[in-house]
Amino acid sequence: MTETPQWIWDTFAFVLLGLIAIDLFSHRGGREVSRGWSVFWSIAWIATGLAFAVFIWSILGRHAADEYLAAYLIEKSLSLDNMFVFLIIFQTLKIPKKNQRTALSWGIFGALVFRAVFIFAGAAAVQRWDWVSYIFGVILIFAAIHAFREDPAETKESRVVHWLSTRLPISRDSRDRRFFIKHWGKRKATPLFISILALELSDVLFAVDSIPAAFSVTQTTFLIYSSNAFAILGLRSLYIVIAEFIGEMRYLHYGMAAILAFAGMKITLSRWVHISPIVSVAVILNLIGAATAASMWALKRSANR
């Protein structure tokens, strides 16, 4: 497993903290963010992630940059599945749009912390026991089968929200921006707080798929975490952009299933079959592109009827 110089980690940490500060500053206040502004920020986040690939290329070489791009594309593609979950959580709890931004901010920052824990633990396990890679492969193949069979767009209620609501007293006011309130002398969690918990728990479940998928293209801890971080940072803006029609992307889950299956087969057969990072990038782009194009075609066709 390749060791990354400490100064590169320090540079990444400095850039990451700076980007988080910019994100918080640019979205401060309780105003509802326009779709056009969110499109701008989505493009900006993607451009930043790609610019970091150029930095990696200049410091660590082309092969490392290709691995970073492959891991970034995997995380970015699979995060589209997260959008379905975000939408269902907010619909279940009836969270207004201005509060959704707050929930997404907490959810994304929490995801950065949890992903770090999972990635470092996974890297340590792979380094110590070679057979862990095959477990990752099996997990990905089963996840692909599940993604193929179950369309998240058809889910009407969040199971995570239902589970939390049976264990915590919840207030009914979904417009409240506080996390807890007192009602008749009893402390209750607000729907906003429950939505944040649901987002965090959902991301933990998604990490079980996405992190092993990243290990299928690289085992360098720095490349996995940096690619995950840059892919995650733009999720809030991306959600605002596509929330209105994400539920209509009927073939998207087949693309997710194909990506998971590809990653699972790649990591399982890595001892006998070598697939370069740049080929992985091409495969992922084609799979997600085909699924998106098919979904948009079906959406346009149904609209013309």
Predicted regions and their residues:
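Multi-pass alpha-helical transmembrane bundle typical of ion/small-solute transporters
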Residues: 1-305
